[in-house]
């Protein structure tokens, strides 16, 4: 009898491991690190110029968050005992978004000796978080 309980426990743990439903940080981080499409920061270069004034443009290194989140998106119907369903579904989804960023500025030289300052957020890290509706 004891062997059957042990075998059943081992089978359940194996099933949970296959489904990815474990609490092990090491296992889940390994799964995330091995996914090349995971949510992460990507660098790119873009030209910054003023939309109205004649200023010399500058090439700037920027970063964006891009990739997939491991959590599944889901929508379920809500059951109500009212004839009016204000919100007929409960939805949950996760998006790849900036986690930390810093404010940066650059100066553009414009005609007539004028200088304009452009500001932007430079993304330092990305993570998955619940999407807002």
Swiss-Prot record:
Matching InterPro entries: Cys_knot_C, Cystine-knot_cytokine, DAN, Norrie_dis
Subunit structure, as described in the record: Homodimer; disulfide-linked. Component of a complex, at least composed of TSPAN12, FZD4, LRP5/6 and norrin (NDP). Binds FZD4 with high affinity. Interacts with LRP6 (via Beta-propellers 1 and 2).
Compartments reported by the entry: Secreted
A single BP term in Gene Ontology: extracellular matrix-cell signaling
Organism of origin: Bos taurus (Bovine)
Disulfide linkage: 39-96, 55-110, 65-126, 69-128
Pfam families cross-referenced by the UniProt entry: DAN (PF03045)
Annotated ranges, domain CTCK: 39-132
PROSITE patterns tied to this protein: CTCK_1, CTCK_2
Any one Gene Ontology cellular component term annotated for this protein: cell surface
Signal peptide span: 1-24
This protein's UniProt keywords: Disulfide bond, Secreted, Signal, Wnt signaling pathway
Broad class of the protein's primary localization: secreted
GO MF annotation: an example: protein homodimerization activity
Recorded name of the encoding gene: NDP
Protein name: Norrin
Role description: Activates the canonical Wnt signaling pathway through FZD4 and LRP5 coreceptor. Plays a central role in retinal vascularization by acting as a ligand for FZD4 that signals via stabilizing beta-catenin (CTNNB1) and activating LEF/TCF-mediated transcriptional programs. Acts in concert with TSPAN12 to activate FZD4 independently of the Wnt-dependent activation of FZD4, suggesting the existence of a Wnt-independent signaling that also promote accumulation the beta-catenin (CTNNB1). May be involved in a pathway that regulates neural cell differentiation and proliferation.
């Amino acid at each position: 009898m004891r062997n059957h309980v042990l075998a059943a426990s081992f089978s359940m743990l194996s099933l949970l491991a296959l489904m990815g439903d474990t609490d092990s940080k090491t296992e889940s981080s390994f799964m995330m690190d091995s996914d090349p499409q995971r949510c992460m920061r990507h660098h790119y270069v873009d030209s910054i110029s003023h939309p109205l004034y004649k200023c010399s443009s500058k090439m700037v290194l920027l970063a964006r968050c891009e990739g997939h989140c491991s959590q599944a998106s889901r929508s379920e119907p809500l059951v109500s005992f009212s004839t009016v369903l204000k919100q007929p579904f409960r939805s949950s989804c996760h998006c790849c978004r900036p986690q930390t960023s810093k404010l940066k500025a650059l100066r553009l030289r414009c005609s007539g000796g004028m200088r304009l300052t452009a500001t932007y957020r430079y993304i330092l890290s990305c993570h998955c978080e619940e999407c807002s509706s």
